[in-house]
Each structure stands twice: as C-alpha cells, then as structure tokens.
C-alpha cells in the first residue's frame, strides 16, 4: 500500500477489524519510511448498477461521491467517519438489493436523506438544500417545517 504522506510502498498493519456493518475491513497501517499512520478500508467489489442522471446521462455508481456529499453535510457536526461509512454502506447495500441494472439519482438521494435524517437533522437539512436545489428561502422553510412536523409526530 502506498503511503499517502511520503509515497513509500511498504507499511505494516497495526490493527485490523471489521467495520460496524460487517461489510468492510478497517486497517490501521504505519509507513515503514516516515512512520506516519493511515487507515485503509477493504471491501468486496460488487457489481453495481449504472446511475441515470437527471439529464439522462449514465455513469458508474461511485461510492466516493456519496461519501463526499454526506461528509460535507456532516462537517462540524457530531458525526464520526465510521457513521458516515456505515450510512454509505447501507445505501450501497440498498442499491444492490434492488437488483436493477440502472438506478436514478433520485432513488439514491432519497435513500441518503432518509438515513441522514435519523443520524443528524442539521446534516440532513444541509444535504437536502444541495440535493433538492431549493430555488428560494420559501422552499427551504417548507422543508424545515416538514421536518419539525415529523419530529412532533415522532415524540
């Protein structure tokens, strides 16, 4: 494994364990050159469906895009990297279980929002504001009112 800090190709595994969802192996590694530590995740490569974008373009399912979007929404929130990984793994599993050859971005986005809402409501609102591309403050306020209403019903 190439060290992300110095580029050296040799390292040693310091710790190895399964992630919470059991879908990957998390490994802490130490570079044999610069001695800095870094984390890698190992998972089985699955055949995932093509993603159909809003404009009709198709591209390969990209887990990293979902991780990036969720991590951005969770910035400065009490959400760990492991929680982000678990959320993305759950979405990825849901997509696989559908068994479709193609999936619309809307299905993926809704799955992410559903899980984010239970994880952290502020992160949910951040993600929804970008994903749903609110045109004005009124649409944003409507979403917040819906969130508050659903919270009231759950309590």
Curated annotation (Swiss-Prot):
The keyword ATP-binding applies. The keyword Repressor applies. Transmembrane segments: none annotated. It holds the Pfam family Zn_ribbon_NrdR. Keywords: ATP-binding, DNA-binding, Metal-binding, Nucleotide-binding, Repressor, Transcription, Transcription regulation, Zinc, Zinc-finger. A zinc finger (unnamed) spans 3-34. One of its GO terms (molecular function) is zinc ion binding. NCBIfam families: transcriptional regulator NrdR (TIGR00244). HAMAP family: NrdR (MF_00440). Belongs to the NrdR family. This is Transcriptional repressor NrdR. The lineage of its organism: Bacteria, Pseudomonadati, Myxococcota, Myxococcia, Myxococcales. The gene is nrdR.
């Amino acid at each position: 494994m190439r060290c992300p800090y110095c580029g050296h190709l040799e390292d040693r595994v310091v710790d190895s364990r399964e992630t919470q969802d059991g879908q990957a192996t998390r490994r802490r590694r130490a570079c044999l050159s610069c001695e800095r530590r870094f984390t890698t995740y190992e998972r089985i490569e699955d055949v995932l469906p093509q993603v159909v974008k809003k404009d009709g373009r198709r591209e390969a399912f990209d887990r990293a895009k979902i991780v990036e979007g969720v991590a951005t929404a969770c910035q400065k929130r009490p959400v760990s990297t492991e929680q982000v990984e678990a959320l993305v793994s759950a979405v990825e599993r849901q997509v696989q279980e559908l068994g479709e050859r193609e999936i619309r971005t809307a299905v993926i986005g809704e799955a992410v929002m559903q899980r984010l809402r239970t994880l952290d409501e502020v992160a949910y609102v951040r993600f929804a504001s970008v994903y749903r591309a609110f045109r004005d403050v009124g649409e944003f306020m409507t979403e917040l009112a819906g969130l508050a209403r659903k919270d009231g019903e759950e309590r």
